[in-house]
């Protein structure tokens, strides 16, 4: 960050921008400009940059629009991160709770959208430890599920405990939570499909 003359931090959440600003100060990065802006808003007044990065922010209603905006903002290259799994919470656990399984678009969706746009993107994978892997006790497992899904009803807790008692706690959660890093050299606007 010290070799970059100016950094723009863009987010729809003022809270997220405040956290990012505090971290920038801690890192002595004083060459950052903060802009509160949503994916759905116009970006025409945002400065074009050499590199655009969208990390953990691409669960959007219109992926094509988001990828187009990032491509058009970057003179050189775009980097985005996307879920590898289609869910933050195991579908098995969602079913054990008696809930409808909610799966989200993962990196394959973004890659397909980019391909349809005429962008031949690269994919690398980031393997990170799963912070919810320790399910060695019922209490710890329940904390992990609540952290991911919010409060549970008494009936859901009962269903979950019955399910937990039938499992090997070491096999409940994967060892890693993986992300896909998708990147491409920016494409001229007129070349996009």
Q: Residue locations for each model-derived region?
A:
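A short, conserved alpha-helix within the catalytic core of class I
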Residues: 58-73
